[in-house]
Amino acid sequence: QQDYTGAHFDF
């Protein structure tokens, strides 16, 4: 999962 919201990196 790639949630590039600001500085959110959830792989």
Swiss-Prot record:
Keywords: Amidation, Amphibian defense peptide, Hypotensive agent, Pyrrolidone carboxylic acid, Secreted, Sulfation. It comes from the Eukaryota. One of its GO terms (cellular component) is extracellular region. The modification Phenylalanine amide is found at F11. Its main location: secreted. Signal peptide: none annotated. The modification Pyrrolidone carboxylic acid is found at Q1. Isoform 2.2Y4 differs from isoform 2.2 in not being sulfated. It is found in: Secreted. Expressed by the skin dorsal glands. GO terms for biological process: defense response; regulation of blood pressure. Belongs to the gastrin/cholecystokinin family. Hypotensive neuropeptide. This is Caerulein-2.2/2.2Y4. The lineage of its organism: Eukaryota, Metazoa, Chordata, Craniata, Vertebrata.
